[in-house]
Amino acid sequence: MTNPAPSDALVIAGKHYRSRLLTGTGKFKDLDETRLATEAAAAEIVTVAIRRVNIGQDPNAPSLLDVLPPERYTLLPNTAGCYTAEEAVRTCRLARELLDGHNLTKLEVLGDEKTLYPDVVQTLKAAEQLVADGFEVMVYTSDDPILAKRLEEIGCVAVMPLAAPIGSGLGIQNKYNLLEIIDNAKVPIIVDAGVGTASDAAIAMELGCDGVLMNTAIAGARDPILMASAMRKAIEAGREAFLAGRIPRKRYASASSPVDGVIG
């Protein structure tokens, strides 16, 4: 991935990243495909579901760390599968033990198994506890602008509103709420969940999101490695388009050729 100017790096908890594409590590057919897709995406931050993926809990089983070493990647342990604040906090503390004091974590507390929408009450409760416990919390939440701001005020280092339900592939469903969240934020806003294809990722970046996290859109594609590459390019293009500034929408045409001095 092309190195951005230092002023355009993604900064999370004081650390600078070149890539604005964050990827998950679940749903791939094996660890080798996970590695290849992560490399094709040029991701630097990768999420790990502590309750589902081995990062040392079972010393006799293959470990994700064998293919995605912490020396090369920022591992982002997440609380996928947690439905209460207590479960989420306990999972984060386990991750910190397994990763030698690693404090960066992705908090998600789900409301039900059908929608996988966040339980915002439990999310707020867990976020407060984790921040007080010294964690650097990146938090999965709804696209409610008021809630997003509240999570920032609690001390979360990044807010991660959904674009659509997890794994749905529906794309950006409420760009106006995302714009409101972005406009009011002083921490990175990273779209999490709902991306289905490269154009969805580009739209999120064109809106002004600081990054996009995805898993199913890549792992569930017919060719995950190729899709990872497509997503990387979409993120880059969307970011450049945002920085360049799109032209305003108009109802009527506007000639692209100058009209002054037209012959005849």
Curated annotation (Swiss-Prot):
The keyword Cytoplasm applies. Its EC number is 2.8.1.10. One of its GO terms (biological process) is thiamine diphosphate biosynthetic process. It comes from Xanthomonas euvesicatoria pv. vesicatoria (strain 85-10) (Xanthomonas campestris pv. vesicatoria). CDD domains: ThiG. 1-deoxy-D-xylulose 5-phosphate binds at G167, A193, G194, N215, T216. This is Thiazole synthase. Belongs to the ThiG family. The keyword Transferase applies. Catalyzes the rearrangement of 1-deoxy-D-xylulose 5-phosphate (DXP) to produce the thiazole phosphate moiety of thiamine. Sulfur is provided by the thiocarboxylate moiety of the carrier protein ThiS. In vitro, sulfur can be provided by H(2)S. The active site is at K106. Keywords: Cytoplasm, Schiff base, Thiamine biosynthesis, Transferase. GO terms for molecular function: thiazole synthase activity. Pathway: Cofactor biosynthesis; thiamine diphosphate biosynthesis. It is found in: Cytoplasm. One of its GO terms (cellular component) is cytoplasm. SUPFAM superfamilies: ThiG-like. Homotetramer. Forms heterodimers with either ThiH or ThiS.
